[in-house]
């Protein structure tokens, strides 16, 4: 019979990634420059490509400080300049050159690129109401289909995971992309359930083969954002 000193303790399980898994920190780019009717955004491959706003550059610096000690092995950005601008402070701290992953660029908004989506959202356009009601981007004229968007996102995450087993990577991307990743990871019935990651926020995904595990969503503690 065991004595109290010999009793075995059964502690709560602490998560650790499975062997061969990839930890991905998904960072939404910092706040970008505002859309103005008399100064439309430059387009890259048909998509709006604004620079970071001053607030966004501050977000980038804060992200760099937050992730500097997280044992990150590789950085990825998209073809849109706000993502490499956000990644720059962390890249400088780690001495890493970001790689471009084109398929993690933002959803293509068709005829509503060039800042029109922001304008029509502000004005309460009927199609914006339809978009939220139906949980589909492709109600916007000419927009990328949900099937195309979801497919390229899943393929890109799979490629990055396959290239980085047992490593941590940071991916600087966009709000729509992060929302789609976490909707797929959680099998959410509401396709827009995770739409709304804040600028400069950090979300944490663990990928092990076809298994995507949500560890953290929309962490903004480094931005000193109040609740609300």
Protein language model regions, located:
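Active-site-proximal alpha-helix that buttresses catalytic centers in soluble enzyme cores
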Residues: 2-25, 31-100
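Active-site signature of alpha/beta-hydrolase-fold catalytic machinery across serine-
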Residues: 89, 180-184
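Acidic, low-complexity terminal tails and accessory targeting/binding regions
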Residues: 1-23, 66, 99, 107-119, ...
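Short beta-strand scaffold positions
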Residues: 77-78, 151, 172-173
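Phosphate-handling substructures
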Residues: 50-51, 94-154, 215-218, 227-228
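Glycine-rich phosphate-binding loops at beta-strand->alpha-helix junctions
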Residues: 82, 177-180
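Generic structural signal for well-ordered alpha-helical scaffold segments
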Residues: 61-68, 150, 154-162, 182
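Active-site metal-binding loops of divalent metal-dependent hydrolases
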Residues: 30, 175
């Amino acid at each position: 019979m065991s004595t109290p000193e010999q009793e075995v303790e059964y502690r709560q399980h602490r998560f650790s990634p499975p062997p061969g898994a990839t930890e991905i920190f998904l960072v939404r780019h910092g706040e970008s420059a505002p859309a103005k009717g008399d100064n439309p955004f430059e387009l890259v491959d048909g998509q709006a490509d604004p620079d970071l706003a001053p607030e966004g550059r501050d977000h980038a610096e804060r992200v760099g400080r937050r992730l500097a000690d997280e044992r990150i092995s590789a950085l990825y950005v998209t073809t849109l300049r706000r993502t490499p601008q956000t990644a720059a402070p962390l890249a400088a701290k780690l001495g890493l050159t970001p790689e471009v992953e084109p398929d993690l660029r933002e959803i293509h908004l068709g005829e509503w690129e060039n800042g029109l989506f922001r304008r029509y959202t502000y004005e309460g356009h009927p199609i914006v109401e339809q978009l939220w009601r139906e949980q589909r981007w492709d109600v916007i004229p000419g927009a990328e289909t949900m099937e195309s968007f979801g497919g390229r996102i899943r393929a890109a995450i799979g490629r990055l995971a396959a290239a980085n087993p047992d490593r941590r990577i940071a991916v600087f991307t966009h709000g729509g992309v992060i929302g789609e990743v976490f909707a797929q990871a959680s099998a959410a019935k509401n396709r827009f359930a995770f739409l709304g990651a804040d600028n400069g926020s950090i979300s944490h995904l663990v990928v092990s083969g076809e298994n995507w595990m949500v560890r953290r969503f929309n962490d903004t503690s480094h931005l000193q954002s109040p609740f609300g």
